[in-house]
Amino acid sequence: MQTLDRPNAPSQQPYPEPVYPRRPTRTVAVGNVLIGSQHPVVVQSMINEDTLDIDAAVAAIRRLHEAGSEIVRVTVPSMAHAKAMEAIRSKLIQTYKPVPLVADVHHNGIKIALEVAQYVDKVRINPGLFVLEKPQPGRTEYTQAELEAIRNKIRETFTPLVQTLKAQNKALRIGVNHGSLAERMLFMYGDTPEGMVESALEYAEICAEQDFHNVVLSFKASRPQVMLAAYRLAARRFDALGLNYPFHLGVTEAGDGEYGRIKSAVGIGTLLAEGIGDTIRVSLTEAPEKEIPVAYGILQALNLRKTMVEYVACPSCGRTLFNLEEVLQKVRAATQHLVGLDIAVMGCIVNGPGEMADADYGYVGKTPGYISLYRGKEEVKKVPESEGVQALIELIKADGRWVDPPEGSPSN
């Protein structure tokens, strides 16, 4: 009888190496936060208060930072808003702590950007709007001379900002939006990912000419398939040119509720799974603080950052020996503060032990009225279902992995 060769010994690592290794990038510092492939993926968001309202802006920045936004962006549409950033930064330091801040600058914004650069850690510009080209209805072509004149105007306008940021050791985001490409980009490339990439490249090459590389790039669109194509193309194009700048990921105008979260998870999560992306912002039409758990959830699902307990639970079926949904909620309520643990709650022994083999602890339906507790793959004890949650807590305590929940937490 023919026999098969013995397979290689299984890896001892609980998780396989990613199919796509992370895209190598430079490191860019935004205040005390480092963005790039050698560092954890950074979560950020943006306040929606008017920057001229100093107290409201400071409170909003603090709320976001406390919620887990490691970098906070503010809109700076005028010179008055730019000057207000000095007071905002000062009050943050006095009443809270320094927070890495990004100023969002758009239409013909060079004077605003130069002013605000001294008060923030990063300036974000939109290439489609920074040197605004007045559209000409009925235009049928751009001459080479016209294109060269626009490029020269961009270089002349943009270079002082690059030099200022370089001198101050600040960062820049070249943030392209699919919905605001310049007219000539639309004329040459259409409303396409190619136009988005070329729009960013035009500005990035000026940065490289000035030997300024504290640059982050983004290529956002409201449709995940467009942003996916743009980021993939950008990774190939920029890396081929040696401009391996970090990428800021996001689906802009994702909407609200469940569908907004799904769109963000599809767009951001797909790229992260491919090794593309170094900082993320989930954009929801909701209070900005609600974006943060979604962002960390995406990172946890991909095993990129662990900020909560990982619960493994089956969907339930006719073999389930207890109310799985109810028990999962009880287990979660008792253990959700034990960040770093993987806990499985499985309804029966058919798939339970195998499906939860890489969990730290398992709670599995054994026979009617009884459950088994596991430590990894090892069955530790069988207890009445009514004692299951407390027995799980005692097992975790016996292993020295229990900590008391913080005061006021749901686990307390």
Swiss-Prot record:
One GO BP: terpenoid biosynthetic process
Polar residues compositional bias, start-end: 1-12
GO molecular function, one term: iron ion binding
EC number(s) stated in the UniProt entry for this protein: 1.17.7.1
Cofactor dependence: [4Fe-4S] cluster
Major enzyme class: oxidoreductase
Keyword presence, Transcription: no
Gene3D superfamilies: Dihydropteroate synthase-like (3.20.20.20), Sulfite Reductase Hemoprotein, domain 1 (3.30.413.10)
Renumbered residue ranges of the record's region Disordered: 1-22
The reaction(s) this protein catalyses: (2E)-4-hydroxy-3-methylbut-2-enyl diphosphate + 2 oxidized [2Fe-2S]-[ferredoxin] + H2O = 2-C-methyl-D-erythritol 2,4-cyclic diphosphate + 2 reduced [2Fe-2S]-[ferredoxin] + H(+)
UniProt KW keywords: 4Fe-4S, Iron, Iron-sulfur, Isoprene biosynthesis, Metal-binding, Oxidoreductase
Binding site for [4Fe-4S] cluster: 314, 317, 348, 355
Keyword Membrane carried by entry: no
Pathway, per record: Isoprenoid biosynthesis; isopentenyl diphosphate biosynthesis via DXP pathway; isopentenyl diphosphate from 1-deoxy-D-xylulose 5-phosphate: step 5/6
Cofactor note: Binds 1 [4Fe-4S] cluster.
Domain of life: Bacteria
Pfam families: GcpE
PANTHER family in UniProt: 4-HYDROXY-3-METHYLBUT-2-EN-1-YL DIPHOSPHATE SYNTHASE, 4-HYDROXY-3-METHYLBUT-2-EN-1-YL DIPHOSPHATE SYNTHASE (FERREDOXIN), CHLOROPLASTIC
NCBIfam families per record: ispG_gcpE (TIGR00612), PRK00366.1 (NF001540)
Function: Converts 2C-methyl-D-erythritol 2,4-cyclodiphosphate (ME-2,4cPP) into 1-hydroxy-2-methyl-2-(E)-butenyl 4-diphosphate.
Family: Belongs to the IspG family.
Protein name: 4-hydroxy-3-methylbut-2-en-1-yl diphosphate synthase (ferredoxin)
Source species: Synechococcus sp. (strain JA-3-3Ab)
